């Protein structure tokens, strides 16, 4: 992964336009996905006169740099005792991105969850399985650090057909 992006060059004007999205100014914890960052969003940014006529390779390189910069900013804000970062999900297949992230965060060890014996592609499924187990056991889960919830709660529900 990342071969296409690795053939392009990051375009600073485009990168600045991408970083102007209000999401990046939000304080953690935060989460997002395709509801905000999608082809329609990218097309709107690319239609801006400041960033017209960028090659597809350069768009890919710039998007990769955006991912790297935004992750690195959060990692560099962590306490100094955090030395290892475990990556999971589809992005772990992007060797170009992981190499950029490691270069941007030289004081952190950037590895996949494979180092813990957990396939990076399976971590989300494993997490949801654990959440389901907690629900079946009627055990509340405290996700305050991730969601800003003020108390632990039973997540999900069981509905018999």
Tell me what each language-model feature is:
Residues 69-153:
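Catalytic phosphate/nucleotide-handling subdomain of diverse soluble enzymes
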């Amino acid at each position: 992964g990342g071969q296409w992006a690795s053939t392009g060059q990051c375009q600073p004007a485009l990168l600045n336009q991408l970083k102007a999205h209000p999401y990046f100014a939000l304080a953690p914890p935060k989460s997002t996905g395709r509801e905000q960052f999608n082809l329609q969003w990218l097309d709107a940014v690319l239609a801006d006169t400041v960033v017209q006529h960028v090659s597809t390779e350069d768009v890919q390189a710039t998007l990769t740099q955006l991912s790297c910069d935004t992750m690195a900013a959060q990692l560099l804000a962590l306490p100094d005792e955090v030395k290892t970062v475990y990556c999971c999900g589809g992005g772990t297949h992007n060797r170009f991105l992981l190499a950029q992230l490691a270069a941007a965060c030289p004081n952190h060890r950037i590895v996949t969850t494979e180092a813990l014996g957990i396939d990076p592609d399976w971590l989300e499924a494993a997490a949801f399985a654990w959440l389901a187990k907690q629900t079946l056991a009627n055990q509340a889960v405290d996700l305050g650090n991730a969601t800003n919830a003020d108390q632990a709660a039973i997540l999900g529900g069981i509905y018999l057909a």
